């Protein structure tokens, strides 16, 4: 069997008025670094993002499915799917494939009429609403140590951005499957923002 691209650290946190998502950009095949620029955060709808950990091909297939479903729902109903609905749909897709599973961990985060929300999903479709912090992937045990130590409810979007970068940056130091650049996304009720690399690098230098 051909070995698949995999490996990751992703994090997500709920902030005051929004959600912050972050990941690194390394994909591995065993001990080989297959890519230094792997995309792991995807925009699903106007104010919803999804992070992926696990097998890259499986994750990309799921992203295409859920993006199409979100667009179709908006066209038919004239309004967006809620974050809970997007998560439930993904859960159903994953559960239906439980005997031949998508080898992924997902985080869905964003802002809808209910406010900022983050959910995590496992490969068999189990879903959990995370009310503060979440991390997935091989570097998650390290990232969780940073998040648990420094997260406080009501954190601002800017401070949340720094915390997410710190968590991923720390994981990259110890997890060989995580590395290279850091991607950062901020979502508020007004916008989905992919933070420029220059700003992320400035945050890293300030740590």
From Swiss-Prot:
Compartments where located: Cytoplasm
Propeptide section residues: 1-7
Role according to the record: Component of the proteasome core, a large protease complex with broad specificity involved in protein degradation.
Subunit-level organization: The 20S proteasome core is composed of 14 alpha and 14 beta subunits that assemble into four stacked heptameric rings, resulting in a barrel-shaped structure. The two inner rings, each composed of seven catalytic beta subunits, are sandwiched by two outer rings, each composed of seven alpha subunits. The catalytic chamber with the active sites is on the inside of the barrel. Has a gated structure, the ends of the cylinder being occluded by the N-termini of the alpha-subunits. Is capped at one or both ends by the proteasome regulatory ATPase, PAN.
Xref: HAMAP family: Proteasome_B_A
Active site: 8 (nucleophile)
GO molecular-function term, one example from the UniProt record: threonine-type endopeptidase activity
Catalyzed chemical reaction(s): Cleavage of peptide bonds with very broad specificity
Record EC number: 3.4.25.1
Top EC class for this record: hydrolase
Gene name in the database record: psmB
GO cellular component: cytoplasm; proteasome core complex, beta-subunit complex
The keyword Nucleus belongs to this UniProt entry's keyword annotation: no
Signal peptide: none
Annotated source species: Methanothrix thermoacetophila (strain DSM 6194 / JCM 14653 / NBRC 101360 / PT)
Regulation: The formation of the proteasomal ATPase PAN-20S proteasome complex, via the docking of the C-termini of PAN into the intersubunit pockets in the alpha-rings, triggers opening of the gate for substrate entry. Interconversion between the open-gate and close-gate conformations leads to a dynamic regulation of the 20S proteasome proteolysis activity.
Stored NCBIfam families: arc_protsome_B (TIGR03634)
UniProt similarity note: Belongs to the peptidase T1B family.
Keyword annotations from UniProtKB, A to Z: Autocatalytic cleavage, Cytoplasm, Hydrolase, Protease, Proteasome, Threonine protease, Zymogen
GO biological process, one term: proteasomal protein catabolic process
Protein's name according to its UniProt entry: Proteasome subunit beta
């Amino acid at each position: 069997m051909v070995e698949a691209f995999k490996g990751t650290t992703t994090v997500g946190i709920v902030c005051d008025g929004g959600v912050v998502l972050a990941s690194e950009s390394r994909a591995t095949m065993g001990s080989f670094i297959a890519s230094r620029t792997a995309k792991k955060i995807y925009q699903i709808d106007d104010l919803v993002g999804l992070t992926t950990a696990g097998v890259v091909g499986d994750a990309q297939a799921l992203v295409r499915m859920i993006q199409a479903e979100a667009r179709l729902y908006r066209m038919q109903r004239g309004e967006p799917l809620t974050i809970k609905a997007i998560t439930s749909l993904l859960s159903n897709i994953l559960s239906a494939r439980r005997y031949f599973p998508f080898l992924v961990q997902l985080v869905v985060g964003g802002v809808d009429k209910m406010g900022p929300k983050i959910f995590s999903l496992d490969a068999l479709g189990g879903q959990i609403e995370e009310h503060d912090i979440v991390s997935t992937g091989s570097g998650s045990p390290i990232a969780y140590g940073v998040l648990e130590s420094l997260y406080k409810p009501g954190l601002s979007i800017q401070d949340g951005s720094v915390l997410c970068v710190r968590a991923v940056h720390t994981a990259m130091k110890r997890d060989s499957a995580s590395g290279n650049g850091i991607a950062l996304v901020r979502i508020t009720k007004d916008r989905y923002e992919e933070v420029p690399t220059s700003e992320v690098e400035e945050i890293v230098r300030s740590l």
